[in-house]
Amino acid sequence: VCSSDLAIQAMIYLAETKPEKPVMIRKIAAEYNIPYHFLAKIMQTLVKQRLIKAVRGRTGGVLLAKDPKKIFLNDIVYAIDGLPPEKEQCIVGLDLCTDDAPCPLHDQWKPIRSKLRELMSSEPLDVLAKNVIKKRKLMNG
């Protein structure tokens, strides 16, 4: 599991809870069985990237910094992993992989990569959270 996966899970958790009530990071860590200090570092990055707000004090915690309809998967992934490189990386690791000089998988990988980017920039957090809730209900009967 990578850091951006955990960030997405934590953001879904925040989208599922009351937006005006801060949630303790320990609670999210316990819910997903993530080491607290590891999640705290991830959340610190999300605060710096202005995706969540940290509230200090006895009733403090973290909450979404903006409407979950305006947060997309790519916002979360890029906040944690950084922006994708300007020059596309080859799926098989070759130095040169372009339409003019393709690797053996270039033609198959290019549409998948495009579709993945499209999905990540069009799937808002609120829809993702609703779908996760539905799936949990189906799984739990």
Residue ranges and their predicted role:
Residues 43-44:
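Short, hydrophobic-biased segments on the C-terminal half of alpha helices
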Residues 50-64:
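Beta-hairpin "wing" of winged helix-turn-helix
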Residues 72, 86, 91-141:
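C-terminal regulatory/oligomerization modules of transcriptional regulators
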Residues 26-32:
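A short alpha-helical element within helix-turn-helix/winged-helix DNA-binding domains
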Residues 30, 47-48:
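Alpha-helical residues within the helix-turn-helix
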Residues 10-19:
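Short amphipathic alpha-helical interface segments
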